[in-house]
A protein has these predicted regions:
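Class I SAM-dependent methyltransferase SAM/SAH-binding core
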Residues: 170, 175-224
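A short glycine-rich, Lys/Arg-flanked "PGG" loop and its adjoining helix->strand segment in the class I
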Residues: 247-261
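A short acidic, Gly/Pro-enriched loop at the edge of an enzyme's catalytic core
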Residues: 223-233
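A short SAM/SAH-binding and catalytic strip from SAM-dependent methyltransferases
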Residues: 232-244
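Conserved alpha-helix/loop element of class I SAM-dependent methyltransferases that forms part
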Residues: 145-166
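C-terminal alpha-helical "lid/dimerization" subdomain adjacent to the S-adenosyl-L-methionine
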Residues: 261-320
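Amphipathic alpha-helical dimerization/coiled-coil segments
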Residues: 2-5, 89-136
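N-terminal helix-turn-helix DNA-binding core of bacterial DNA-binding proteins
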Residues: 14-55, 78-85
Length: 331
């Protein structure tokens, strides 16, 4: 009697084995946890986990082969982030289940401290940049996307939200204050936060010139617990200067009153690395899905979005996220 030899699916079994191998090391699991809502370069991860560059590179290679991490080039640097689980594909459900369990882990205190150090190093670079270029701020902005190029689209979206006459607004990183007059005309009270004294002085001068009596300027880190809350929180070309954009959205969410809105104007992902030196950008724009995912993780709901193409090749995304009246479950 002839017996049929079963045909093994080597490709599928290899893929499953690769995923199991990647999840079988404590350091790799902690790397996945650290990448939950952030992205880091190889040197940053080596610093965070106090290990050699070659060692962390090996672990990242194993994670990449298992499709647990993805890479994105930021100028001359390559940053790693978690890859999204595609549950409709083979191993996708196991991938998703692994990440769910990883998210229940708590990173060791020393790892969390080193992550904070990396974030502070990024923030210091951004702060130093704005201290140097305050006098040429507008010229620097115009290299990529000046306010007039997206003002009408942003105002159209803002006006469609029909805020009450008593509503309040908070602008994070107002720059030279170019958008403050528009907010002052639409809201009863406007607060503008900046951690750069030089930039806040430019905003103060504009407020004085235009007589914006209902605008309050504060020299304060927007992520500070003492920051004010408002019905509408606005970030115009600011998020790419934050050390940890996903964490920034999460920490800004409590600043939005229940039922209120977060308006983010940002660059779409690009590869113009000169923007780092010329404009102090820590991140070269963002993928649309990343902003939506970070907002959702913070408990915000996606609403209307507008996308603009510029002649210089850059694309702008104007995004609206709403904080629901009832709290959502936040991962």
């Amino acid at each position: 009697m002839n017996l049929r030899v079963p045909q093994l699916r080597f490709e599928a079994s290899d893929e499953l084995a690769s995923l199991c191998k990647a999840g079988g090391d404590p350091l790799r699991l902690n790397v996945l946890r650290a990448l939950a809502n952030d992205s880091f370069g190889v040197l940053e991860l080596a610093q965070i986990f106090a290990t050699g560059q070659s060692g962390i590179s090996h672990h990242l290679k194993v994670l990449a082969q298992a499709r647990l991490v993805a890479t994105r080039r930021e100028g001359n640097a390559i940053f790693y982030r978690r890859a999204l689980a595609q549950t409709e594909l083979f191993c996708g459900k196991l991938h998703a289940a692994l990440l769910d369990e990883v998210d229940a882990l708590e990173l060791p205190a020393e790892v969390q401290q080193r992550i904070a150090v990396v974030h502070s190093q990024r923030a210091a670079a951004s702060h130093d940049f704005f201290a140097r270029i305050a006098d040429s701020f507008q010229a620097q902005q115009d290299l990529i996307a000046s306010l007039p190029q997206y003002r009408d689209s942003l105002l159209g979206l803002l006006d469609s939200l029909n805020f009450a006459s008593s509503a309040t607004a908070l602008e994070v990183g107002p720059g030279d204050g170019g958008f403050l007059p528009e907010l002052a005309r639409r809201f009863a009270q406007v607060t503008a936060l900046d951690n750069s004294p030089a930039m806040l002085e430019l905003a103060r001068q504009r407020c004085e010139r235009e007589g914006l009596a209902n605008v309050q300027l504060e020299l304060l880190d927007a992520l500070s617990q003492s920051a004010a809350s408002a019905d509408c929180v606005v970030l115009n070309m600011v998020l790419h200067h934050f050390a940890a954009p996903a964490e920034a959205i999460k920490q800004l969410t409590p600043r939005i009153n229940l039922g209120g809105s977060l308006l983010i104007t940002e660059l779409c992902s690009h590869n113009q690395s000169w923007a780092r030196d010329a404009c102090g950008d820590l991140w070269l724009g963002f993928e649309q899905d990343d902003l939506a995912r970070w907002a959702s993780a913070a408990g915000l709901m996606p609403e209307e979005s507008v996308y603009l193409g510029l002649r210089n090749g850059f694309q702008i995304q104007v995004r609206h996220f709403r904080r629901p009246l009832a709290a959502l479950t936040v991962r």
